[in-house]
Amino acid sequence: MLFRSALNEQAEITTAIELCQKIQLKASDISAPPSSLSGGNQQKVVFAKLLNRDLKVLILDEPTKGIDVGAKYSIYEIMNELATNGYAIIMVSSEMPEVLGMADRVVVMRNGRVSGIMENKELTQEMILEHSLKSAEGGEA
């Protein structure tokens, strides 16, 4: 039984190393607890956990909140790679530049109701703000 356990542990270590390389995790030791990492690297650990599962739809709520610009860029790269590889990503964000830069389609909600759905091709900050001020029935709130 110890032999089988050692094989599983070695496979887990190999998988962890591959995932850390894939997400470009900056950690001095692969066995370091995520709580000892920077906020950006903690977010990367979350992505590594997602990549270790065979998921095709990801719902990300404020994936870059509270992390520095360099870490945000790294998270955006990971998200773009996932989208290129067929993952569907639903991102919730309150950061306008993030929405404009990352989304293919934007759904604006106000008071729990959809007030606008827009393709990103010609999307502007003003259009998003206009929809965020509308009620779900189409009138000004």
Where on the chain are the PLM-derived regions?
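Conserved P-loop NTPase catalytic core
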Residues: 1-37, 116-119, 124-136
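A short, proline-enriched helix->beta-strand linker immediately N-terminal to the Walker B motif
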Residues: 52-56, 62
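Hydrophobic anchor residue at the start of the ABC signature
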Residues: 47
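Helical segment within the ABC ATPase nucleotide-binding domain
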Residues: 73-85
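A short, surface-exposed alpha-helical micro-motif characterized by mixed small hydrophobic
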Residues: 99-101
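ABC-family nucleotide-binding domains
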Residues: 61, 68
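H-loop/switch region of ABC-family ATPase nucleotide-binding domains
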Residues: 93-94
